[in-house]
Amino acid sequence: IPACMVEDGGCWDPLGEAFNSATQRAETLRNL
């Protein structure tokens, strides 16, 4: 499985998406 799979929206990076999700979740908890 390639680290970067090309989709209609361009390039999707599973690890990058997971990292962004974790970052956003941490920011949300911090803002509570």
Swiss-Prot record:
Its main location: secreted. Keywords: Disulfide bond, Glycoprotein, Hormone, Secreted. It is found in: Secreted. One of its GO terms (cellular component) is extracellular region. Placental basal zone cells. One of its GO terms (molecular function) is hormone activity. Coiled coil: none annotated. The keyword Hydrolase does not apply. Glycosylated. The keyword Disulfide bond applies. Disulfide bonds join 4-11. Belongs to the somatotropin/prolactin family. This is Growth hormone-related protein 4.
